[in-house]
Every structure is written in C-alpha cells, then in structure tokens.
C-alpha cells in the first residue's frame, strides 16, 4: 500500500531520562502552580550539593579504568581483561607479576597478571594484590569466566558494558535522580545472560561499588551518595525485565500497539489525580483543578474566577463520582461555548476525544461513528458515548481524572501522529479546520498538487517578488509523501506537443503566441579575441539591447530595479559583446541585491524553489531535484546553486547563450490563479452571454393593469411580525433546571396577570404553588388554574368588571383568544351567573380546546395561526388594549365586515374626482389677473420664497483643504477661510485684531491641524465677546452649529444637550464636544475648513439652516445691537 497523505511530521523529542530539577519543575508546571515548600527545599538541597556531586563524578571518571579493571579481574581469569577495553589512550598502570620470573607478555598469556591502582601508595597496592575477599555476597552459581573460552568479541562487549554501568552511575549522581540508571539498566540481565553470566555481572557491579567507595573513605557524605546510586544500579540489574505497556483496541480498524517499559520510565512524570472520600479539602481541590485543566485546558478557577460550585460540592461529598463530574463538565454551558459552538462537528469530536479520553481519534471509522452520534443527539450524546465507553472505564474508571495519553505514556499511532501531537498543544482550540478526518480521507486520494516538501514552499506565481503563503495563519503543514521517482504535473506555456518530457528535442523552440514573449540578443557587434557564439549577428541596435537588459532584470528580480542597484559594468560588457546573456544572468543572480531579496530572508527550500523558477523557467519536479540542489546549497552555498542551474544541460538546450530565461511551465494552481482574475480576461475572446430573464422574475411579472384598491389590498395583506415572534414556554419532563422553571413561572404570571408580579411574590402569595411546580408535584395546567383561583385574579379581573368583560378577559388569559361568537358568550355567562368565577375558570382550563392546544405542560399563549379568520380582528383588538385602559367591552356584538373597496376608490368614481380637482386648479379667467397672480399656493404650483430670496446660499460652498506641499499663498487662503467661517466675517476682509498670529504661524509650520485651529478660534476671547456674552444660550448653540458644523440644530434634543453643556461647563466644553464629534470628523476631518452644508442637509433641517444663515450678527456698533448686554455670572 502506497501512502498518499500525511498529517504532518511533528518533531518528536522523547525524554531519555529525568533529572531532579527538571522533574520537579515539570510537575509544578503541569499542575499550573508555583513550587511548594518541600519542592523548593529539595531543589535547594540538590543545588547545595552540586559541587560535591561534580567532585564525585570527576574523581570516578579519572579512576574509571582502575575501577573497571578491579571488577573485570574479579570475574575473568586466564588472561588480562583490560587488554580488551576500548579506550582513547593507554593509562599509566603499575603491574606486578605474581609468579616472579617471566616477562609481561608471557604473564598475560598465562593469566598471572593483575592491575592495581596508581594512587594510595604502597599499602593500597598491597591491599589490591592480596585482597581476594569479595566486596559483597557472592550469588549462588557464580563461576569465574575464562577469557580464552569467552572470546575476544565477547570480552570487548563485557568490558564496554562495565564501563557503561560506571558511567550511568556518574550521570545519575550529577543529575540527582537515579532515573538514568533505571532506564538503562532494568531489563539488561536477560540480554546479558544470553552471552554471559548474570551472576558474574552482579559480582562485577559489587566490585565497582567497593572500588568506588574506596576513594571516599575520608568523606562520609560523598560515600553515602555513591553508595546510594550504586545500590540502585545493583538492584535494578537484579530486577526482572518489565513487561511492555500494551494498548489493546476493541475494534479491528484501530492499531494495537505496545510501548517498552523503559520509554515509559524515561518520559516525564504525569501525575494522575484520583478523587477519594478520605482526602483532605486541599487535596480534593487539587483534584478538581486537575479536572478543570483537562476538560477546559486551563484552570478556570484561577484564570477567570469561574467554577461550577454545585458540581464541586457534590463530587467532594461523594454524591457523584469523578466520572459523572467529568460528564457534567463536558455538558456545561461553558464547555459548549468554548469547544462546541465555534467549531464544526468534526473538530468538536477531535477536541472531545482530547478532553475526555486523552487522545485523538484513531481511524476514519471511529470518526464516522461518533459523527453520527453528535449529528443525531448533539454534544450531550457525544459526551455520554465517550464517558460510557469501555476505554474510559479501563483507563480512568470511576475516580481518576482523565489525562493526556501522549508520547511516553503509551504507544502512539503512526497514521494520526502529526494531528495527535498538534491536538495536545495549547493552541489546539485556535485551529478551526479538522485535522484527523482530513488526514484519514486524504489516504484514499491521489497525491495533492503541491510542493513535495509542503505547500508553503510554493510561491504565488505572479510577476512581482517572492510571496509565500503565511504559514502562521490557517497553517497547512501537511507534506505530500512524494517518492523519489514522482514528478509534479506542470503545464507547458506553449504548444502541448513541445512538452520537454515527451519531446526533449523541442526545448529550444519558442512558445509562439501561446506563451510569453521571448527576448533574444542577436545584435552583438562582434567578439574580441574569441570565436563568436552560434547564431550571433553583427547587427547592432542600442534600443533592442536595452530591451534585452530590461527583460533580464524583470525575469531575474521580478521587477525593475532602482538606478543605483543596476550592474552598469555588466550591462556595458553585454552591449559590447564581451559577455553573453547567460553570463549576465549569472552576474545578476550572484549580486548582493539578489542575495538580500531571495536568499537571506527565506529557508533554503523556498529559496531554491524561487531561484529555480526564475533562472530555469519552471518549478522543480520533485524530491530528487530538490535534494540535489539542497545538497549543493548546504555544502557550497548560493553561488554553487546558481552555477548548477545555469550550467545544466536543460538551460543550455532551452535558452543557450543569447536568450533571456522566460516562464516555460506553470503549476495548475498558478494557471487557475491567473485565469480567475478579472483583469486577465480578454474582451475580444470573452464568451458572449445571452441575457436571460430568470424564471422567478417572469413568474412575478404583473401582466394586467391593477387598480389602486387592488394594489393597496395586496400591500396590506398578512399579519404583523408578532405571529413569527411568538415564544412557547413548555416544561420538559424529567428536567429540574431551576432557571428554566423560574422563566416558565414568570411567563405564566405575564399571561394570566398581564404583568410581571414580582412585588406580590415578596408577600409569599404564590410561593406554595411555585414550590410544588418546581418539585414536580403539580403540572403547569394545575399551576395556571391555581393562579386563576387566587384572590389577586379575583380582585384585578373579576370584581371591577361586568360578566361580559370577565368572559373576554378569561378567554384571553386561559385560551389565548377572544370569544368566538355570541353563543360562547351566553354559555360562559350562564356559568358565571349560576356557579361563580371558579367554575368559569375550571370550565376554561378543563375544556377540550385547552387540552388540545396547551396540554398539561405548556403556558397559554396568543394563538395567531389557529384562530378563525372572523375572530382574528377581535383578538387583535383585545390584545392591543392595555389592562384597565377602559371598561369598554371589546365584543358587544359581531358586526358585519365592511367591503374592502370603498366607493370613492372605484375606477370610475376616482377618475371623476381627479377631473374635478384638475378643474379647480385652472385659473379663473373671469376674475382680474392680479387676483390670480397674488394668490398663495400650498400645493407646489407657486414659486417658493426660497427660490427668489437667498439663491446664492443654495449653491455649494467652496471647500478649503490644507494638504501637504501647498504654497504659502494657499495656506493664507485656508487661514482667511477659517476666520470668515468661524467669526462670521461678512465682507471677507478679516480685521487684524481678529487674527491670532501665534496660531497662524503654527498652522503654516504644520504644528497644528485645521481642526485644532478651529477649536482655538472658537474658544478665543474675540469669539466669546461676539457670540457668547451678548446672547442667550439657545442663540449661542445656534451660532456654534452654524460656524463649526455648517448647519442649524436639527432637533430639540440637540439644543437641550448643548444647553446643559453650556450651563454646566461653559463655552470651551461645548466647542470641544462639537469639534470632537463624529459628525465633524466625517465631514471635515483634520484638514478641511468647515463650510455651510445647505445643499446636502436633510429637508427637515434645510430651512432652519437657511434661516440661521440669514440672521446677521449684531455688532456692538450697529443700531440693531441690544441696548443692554446680559452678561453671565462668570466665564467657565
């Protein structure tokens, strides 16, 4: 089976061992907490003994060969064991012959040579020679091993293993954790016993321990440390081989795997939290926090101060198990909001697997199974299926909090390796696209059309620059498992018969009109001192040479370069014929500009792909081609890659020496990218689409002439939106949600009493009925009947009204409609008169109509769709009339319905009325002409006063804008326009005492904007004297709107708002509010001078603005100025 898809290959970094510091910090990090007091003390003790541990390791390392030699001499006989130890250099050894006569070589052959330590003096040497007692209890069955029989190969392996044992001990001493010894020693006994003796190895390890301790006789602390780790070494070697961790699967579509125990021992310790009734309160809180971290991927209590206190108390008290606690957390509204509502069902399944089972989906069949469950039953059904599964019971049971079963915890599957590692990341909820089902489905599909090393290595096939997809946004890291012999599908830019795969001899042929334009240099004047290139011409044309140079720049760089970036020397050499086009391309590709643009910023794979497309005119075919260039780049760099492409046989056959490279092949994605762009569609070859009227337009077209009454009837038909917006409150059996019960009770109060009666609840009038309904002792129907029997209902809807009105209200409250006819009114009137209100309500609630429409558990509501047509207007009027609005009876009798077409709307009568109105508009020539001309009109036939007066105000005002780069004269025009607008200078000549020279200077220098200039002028002292002090606040507001917004106040609400602002905070605050308003920003922004906006104003505000503009400002020297200026108590 060939693999055609991959979910990505996340780099796996399995932990090979544990250290004290890393294990302690990792455990605190997994629990999202700070280090505890005990952990800090343990770390402090470890770091305090760091120098001692390094000293021990260094001393053991220096004497490692002597220690190993003692252990080897203890178990091997008949030769020199140390001769088989592979070591970098020969140590300095002191040897003494036991037999005394022969030389060293002969002694080694006879096995009469032993090694002694080189430190400790003469007494230590003697102790080493004559000490034949074992350093520990000799295991039964131990027999020394003869070197000659054991063989050189086995001896080398055994000496290597003894050296490794000592090395593992030194590693563990430095790390502060014996985990290194456990991982590398446990289970070796069975392996060693296949070629050697396990008892002999134990004796050798005991000798290693004794030899190591001999160096620390005067240091009890160091001796204790060495003894501790050596004991672990011996104990772990004696221990039996642990069994592998099996991962059994219930179905055949899932992989059954096993994990060696040493991988589990080396992995990071992942604490497992179990909820027991005997735990302390602190320990129970830790277990609950672990459940939150697993289900919500964060400690919601600490991060967001959220918790589900009801469930917490139940699981702490033992009312529910941890399994049930996990189930309810996964069904909570918080979980639905975080992990259900924002995602599609496939992604919800993946996240639920991670939270509840601690893994990702294993197969496509498993995803399909749970997809069917969530589609039919929603999130609750999915949660129930996962929590009730046999796998959950096997791994977690009733008391254990689920945990992530990732790398090191159990064997990982290969077919979902990448998605599962991504699913365990903290960023998993931020990925919306489902990964597992996408990967599983891709296994059955052909290879995708993408780069063999990932779709992110394909640049956009456009002219300008190297633009690669941004891999941090909607990442698509899934590589395509291309083989070394797989080629990508490329589309030839030219005739298909000239494809180089099927027709290699056609590489040099031009693509013609089906491909890009080809630039070929054929105007060289000659060559100097060398033979001319094949096909070179002696014709010379400066313009065509420059065209070739420009085309080369565009092809190599993707754009034209700046003048200072051009290679002038190479251009001159090309024009003089000293170099060919190929050499010119080579020089451009090796330039610093090309390196900075397309080599330095990118990964090597992306850079190779882009350079290959630019220089050879096509994308790379596959892994084999990419690997070749990648190897060259890693060994020799960019220049070697460029030379390899330009000196290739394909380049020579395609472009030769004098042709500028061009785009020969595109990927299908590149072709689609270019064809789907609107700008690339040629108008002369576009298909002429026939304009066809859609069928629904034809069916909706009016074919007859309709009268006005008919049109009005069609417009007004139907009912209001209230029919669609009706909400039905119904109690669901078996659910005791207090919030839902409370909402249902409130709906019942609003239906029966037509208001929310929260004040009456405080008097406990209905508390008994509410508690019974909440406990399920009564139904909603009985609750409604009880409300109708209450004293409050009798007081509000029975005592003040006659029987007919009581009947109307009763059918409205209990049946959701008005009485159908007079017969129904007579029926209920007789019940009211003979048996009273309770019998009347009982008859309504227990009627067949009530049981069919509302049943036992539904609150009555207004029944729009089921009412008879004749009764609909009565119900509409009854519901739209407020309670106690009047005492009128809505249905005194059923009047006949009036005709929908009024007599004056008939075509004949309407035409006659229109003719009479037209005659009335005609001028009466029997009267004098001046009477007709002086008549006023209110129907638009006469000339408006506005047309004749102030017509200049209706013209669009000139707009002044301060932009960058304008001259001083234009700036002065802008400044004058500001003064004329804000200070209302009629003549256009701004007096000098109005000007603020410091503001003028700042505006010219660009230190302030036009908006700031307007703000300061409107808040200045001259504005205050002209428009603020002499006038009342309402008039000041009118001035401010006209000067700063170019219009009059639109509504009384605006006037009241700014009137309060003026009275409380003064002129400055009002100016700030107007200048900083959204309306000012929308119309004028920062650099536009305010102007009168008369033509663009709404009709309702237009006349007010014209009137305000016509009101001249009364100057102090004018005869129209007020005789007494009403000042204000103080300027704010």
From Swiss-Prot:
Keyword annotations for this protein? Antenna complex, Bile pigment, Chromophore, Electron transport, Lyase, Membrane, Photosynthesis, Phycobilisome, Repeat, Thylakoid, Transport
- Gene3D superfamilies (alphabetical): Phycobilisome linker domain, Phycocyanins
InterPro entries, sorted: Globin-like_sf, PBS_linker_dom, PBS_linker_sf, Phycobilisome_asu/bsu, Phycobilisome_asu/bsu_sf
Enzyme class label: lyase
Residues holding (2R,3E)-phycocyanobilin: 196
Q: Where is the PBS-linker domain?
A: 253-433, 514-692, 709-887, 940-1121
List the subcellular locations: Cellular thylakoid membrane
Name the Pfam families for this protein: PBS_linker_poly (PF00427), Phycobilisome (PF00502)
Q: How does it sit in the membrane?
A: Peripheral membrane protein
Say yes or no: keyword Electron transport present: yes
> What PANTHER family has UniProt attached to this entry?
PHYCOBILIPROTEIN APCE (PTHR34011:SF6), PHYCOBILISOME 32.1 KDA LINKER POLYPEPTIDE, PHYCOCYANIN-ASSOCIATED, ROD 2-RELATED (PTHR34011)
Recorded family membership: Belongs to the phycobilisome linker protein family.
| Protein name as it appears in the record | Phycobiliprotein ApcE
Organism from which the protein derives = Nostoc sp. (strain PCC 7120 / SAG 25.82 / UTEX 2576)
